[in-house]
UniProtKB/Swiss-Prot annotation:
Binds 1 [2Fe-2S] cluster. Binds 1 [3Fe-4S] cluster. The lineage of its organism: Bacteria, Bacillati, Bacillota, Bacilli, Bacillales. [2Fe-2S] cluster binds at residues 64, 69, 84. [4Fe-4S] cluster binds at residues 155, 158, 161, 222. Belongs to the succinate dehydrogenase/fumarate reductase iron-sulfur protein family. The keyword tRNA processing does not apply. It is an enzyme of class 1 (oxidoreductase). It comes from Bacillus subtilis (strain 168). Residues 146-174 form the 4Fe-4S ferredoxin-type domain. It comes from the Bacteria. This is Succinate dehydrogenase iron-sulfur subunit. Its EC number is 1.3.5.1. InterPro entries: 2Fe-2S_ferredoxin-like_sf (IPR036010), 4Fe4S_Fe-S-bd (IPR017896), 4Fe4S_Fe_S_CS (IPR017900), Beta-grasp_dom_sf (IPR012675), Helical_ferredxn (IPR009051), SDH/FRD_Iron-Sulfur (IPR050573), Succ_DH/fum_Rdtase_Fe-S (IPR004489), Succ_DH/fum_Rdtase_N (IPR025192). The keyword Electron transport applies. It catalyses: a quinone + succinate = fumarate + a quinol.
Length: 253
């Protein structure tokens, strides 16, 4: 009888936000077409490490399981990505799972992404409305603009681009590429453009565009293929124009 194939994991764990991280190894039976989340569920069902010791179930975030929500981001074999689309058959073993280091660890592979959401609040990444009553159809966007704006709207706030960016870290206030790309998205909307100057001025503040080192890691790592560096370049132009308006004034009422 042939020996059963197994999958070996080395998982970086942390019991609390303030405790020291440590590595723990697990082994589960191999099944074809497994993804990392399925394997983590298997470990959770029977949390026994390779030493045969009963341990606590591994904690991580997940939701949609189809790369839409962005919740299951983690570092897999050194690369930040979604664990729901990371197929075991395509990964080198042992598979190393770590939490993203850009965000504070809550427990094990679960992180607190508040930093990113606070940046989205700072740049007003939404379109204000007066109420929930029907106002009828809004202004239409030119088709060419709609096409590139749609690409920006694919952002699922997964945090992978922030994890890949060398300028986003605990010593920096840099907001990172995802919130900046959303500024370009909402400024392109005919109604969202009403708050265009406020968003641009937020980017001109501390932690904004000036802190970008143009390493271009973000566009390489984005699971949705969003043209983040294109947005950053466009926003550099927009913020320069905004700086001139602030200095010389504008003839627009």
């Amino acid at each position: 009888m042939s020996e059963q194939k197994t999958i070996r994991f080395i998982i970086t764990r942390q019991d609390t936000a303030d405790s020291t991280p440590y590595d723990e190894e697990f082994e589960i039976p191999y099944r074809p077409n497994l993804n990392v989340i399925s394997a983590l569920m298997e470990i959770r069902r029977n949390p026994v490490n390779v030493k045969g010791e009963k341990t606590t179930p591994v904690t991580w975030d997940m939701n949609c399981l189809e790369e839409v929500c962005g919740a299951c981001s983690m570092v897999i074999n050194g690369k930040p990505r979604q664990s729901c689309t990371a197929l075991i058959d395509q990964l080198e073993q042992p598979i190393r799972l770590k939490p993203m280091k850009t965000f504070p660890v809550v427990r094990d592979l679960q992180v607190d992404r508040s930093r990113m959401f606070d940046s989205l609040k700072k740049v007003k990444a939404w379109i204000p409305i007066d109420g929930t009553y029907d106002l009828g159809p809004g202004p239409r966007m030119p088709e060419k603009r709609r096409q590139w704006a749609y690409e920006l709207s694919k952002c699922m706030t997964c945090g992978v681009c922030l994890e890949a960016c060398p300028n986003v870290n605990s010593k920096s206030k840099f907001m990172g590429p995802a919130p900046m790309s959303q500024v370009r998205l909402f400024n392109a909307h005919p109604t969202g453009a009403m708050n265009k100057s406020e968003r641009l001025e937020a980017l001109m503040d501390e932690g904004g565009l000036a802190d970008c080192g143009n390493s271009q890691n973000c566009v390489q790592s984005c699971p949705k293929g969003i043209p983040l560096t294109t947005s950053i370049a466009a926003l550099n132009r927009d913020t320069n124009l905004q700086a001139f308006r602030n200095f010389f004034g504008s003839d627009r009422v």
